[in-house]
Amino acid sequence: MSLPDKAFPVSWDQFHRDARALAWRIAGLDREWRAIVAITRGGLVPAAIICRELGIRLIETVCIASYHDYTSQGEMQVLKGIGASLLENQGEGVIVVDDLTDTGKTAAIVREMMPRAHFATVYAKPKGRPLIDTFVTEVSQDTWIYFPWDMGFTYQEPIAGGKRG
């Protein structure tokens, strides 16, 4: 798979810093949180970091598949819903976490389930941003973010194209 024109590769260190920055922003809201719902799979890593930083013990997941081939969004499928106890009070006191909001389609489905929950993502694109309450970094809609769990180390060709100087 080749990189698109606008690629945003994120290292583990950068992602950890950004997820902690998201936790700082949420902590600044000075609210009591009863649980976190991680949108799988991308929300699992930031949810773990945010839970640790905010002292939240109760973690739930919701699984909505949209990227079936890692290149374009397909039909949205809810593969696993949210437990009934967290749906009480329309999600009040719950943080919903994902790595990224792209088109906002995933967030819209979860927001229907939990309209009073607080939605937080590490990264946000313009189309999905209106559905998110707190995020850290905005990237353009045509940028593809490469997360550290999707990458490995590979040889990089020199900028000069291998010319000796």
Swiss-Prot record:
UniProt keyword Membrane, yes or no: yes
Its EC number(s): 2.4.2.-, 2.4.2.22
Places the protein is found: Cell inner membrane
Record field: catalytic activity: GMP + diphosphate = guanine + 5-phospho-alpha-D-ribose 1-diphosphate; XMP + diphosphate = xanthine + 5-phospho-alpha-D-ribose 1-diphosphate; IMP + diphosphate = hypoxanthine + 5-phospho-alpha-D-ribose 1-diphosphate
Chain residues that bind GMP: D102, T103, G104, K105, T106, W144, I145
Binding of 5-phospho-alpha-D-ribose 1-diphosphate, residues: R41, G42, D98, D99, L100, T101, D102, T103, G104, K105, T106
Summary of subunit composition and partner proteins: Homotetramer.
Protein's recorded name: Xanthine-guanine phosphoribosyltransferase
InterPro entries, A to Z: PRibTrfase_dom, PRTase-like, Xanthine_Guanine_PRibTrfase
